[in-house]
């Protein structure tokens, strides 16, 4: 267990967000995508798992999982991670949509939304919608786009900046 666990005042229970899991058709390819395009880093936590304990955990007979944990950009070595795994036997997924119930997307803050979207597309991903810009309180401007990784998982790219105020000149 990492050193940044949270304990609520008066409650003797530990809580800490640890990872998000993606089940991939081709874990090696998807791991390479997240490393090269979205700057996730290997922390040398590869997995090749099987056994009765895994069968019990998953409810699957003969389960076999391979994959890797990747450190998400912007975090120290003490997690959270993106866990990309593949099972020997996969069940086909319903295509992801932004308004589907359940976990909908993984969001990344980037410097250049349009440039990162171009990298995603070049690496086999796709765009879901269009790049949009909107204003938030406190003079914040946000740029957003939804995209899909090469296996169809939805990503949100976002960039935030302080809006430039127009100068007022009195002539």
Language model regions located:
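N-terminal beta-strand motif that seeds the catalytic metal site of vicinal oxygen chelate
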Residues: 7-31, 41-48, 52-53, 103-108, ...
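Short, P/G- and charge-enriched loop/turn segments at secondary-structure junctions
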Residues: 8, 54-59, 92-96
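Residue-level preference for beta-strand/loop junctions
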Residues: 14-16, 62-64, 100-102, 139
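Core segments of cupin and vicinal oxygen chelate
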Residues: 23-78, 138-140
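Vicinal oxygen chelate
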Residues: 24-29, 44-46, 78-79, 85-154
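Active-site beta-strand termini and strand-to-loop segments that position acidic
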Residues: 70-75, 147-150, 160
